[in-house]
UniProtKB/Swiss-Prot annotation:
This is Large ribosomal subunit protein uL3. Residues 140-163 are annotated as: Disordered. It comes from Leifsonia xyli subsp. xyli (strain CTCB07). One of the primary rRNA binding proteins, it binds directly near the 3'-end of the 23S rRNA, where it nucleates assembly of the 50S subunit. GO terms for cellular component: cytosolic large ribosomal subunit. Keywords: Ribonucleoprotein, Ribosomal protein, RNA-binding, rRNA-binding. PANTHER family: 50S RIBOSOMAL PROTEIN L3 (PTHR11229), LARGE RIBOSOMAL SUBUNIT PROTEIN UL3C (PTHR11229:SF16). GO terms for biological process: translation.
Length: 219
């Protein structure tokens, strides 16, 4: 059984462009999400000796140097790369094979037909009630129900326990959370344009940043 210290992982940051449809080799129309993945760069390699674990820090998205604070600017200078807007770490056992300043491309990291996981931030829906947020059934439309058809109902007992239990599903802010979709198939790769076509939907709105990695639970 592989652990986080022995497992080899690959991952890249990209931008969700939207959804479209493509035909496969069997003339079946496949819905796909288009993810733009311009080359990521390695900004730091973490080792057990220096950091206690193996990992690769990657960066994505150009940003004006004037908008970067001095500690971040020094970090990018040490890696020999221009400042980038987004950073993330990939825990992988083969981190020693990477070097600071190395470019990682979509065609060099993924291949058509493999399974990937996509991590993103779900669309924000604002303040939502329990029927929309938690799929509650609501209150009866008749039989004495009066102006409370979409209310949650009771949220706890009276004298015992005289409180509302933690985790009670109630109305509140919906969406805007980190979501991971597992085992999506890479339908196609356009290396020239830096595009990754993934079968199905991925979290987030158009233009949002997503993290694509090889499937951790894939067959």
């Amino acid at each position: 059984m592989s652990t986080i210290d022995t497992k080899t992982s690959r991952g890249l940051l990209g931008k969700k462009l939207g959804m479209t449809q493509v035909w496969d080799e069997n003339d079946t129309l496949i819905p796909v999400t288009v993810i733009e993945i311009t080359p990521n760069v390695v900004t730091q390699v973490r080792t057990p000796e220096a950091d206690g674990y193996n990992a690769v820090q990657i960066a994505y998205g150009q940003i004006d140097r004037r908008k970067v604070n001095k500690p971040s600017a020094g970090h990018f200078d040490k890696a020999g790369v221009t400042p980038r807007r987004h950073l993330t770490e990939v825990r992988t056992a083969d981190a020693a094979e990477y070097s600071a300043g190395q470019e990682l491309t979509v065609d060099g990291t993924f291949e058509a037909g493999q399974l990937v996981d996509v991590v993103g931030t779900s669309k924000s829906k604002g303040f939502a009630g329990v029927m929309k947020r938690h799929n509650f059934q609501g209150v009866s439309a008749s039989h004495g129900a009066h102006r409370n058809h979409r209310k949650p109902g009771s949220i706890g007992a009276s004298s015992t326990p005289s409180r509302v239990f933690k985790g009670m599903r109630m109305a509140g802010r919906m969406g805007g959370e980190r979501v991971t979709v597992l085992n999506l198939k890479v339908q196609a790769i356009d290396a020239e344009k830096g595009l990754l076509l993934v079968k199905g939907a991925v979290p987030g709105a158009r233009g949002r940043i997503v993290f694509v990695r090889n499937a951790v639970k894939g067959a």
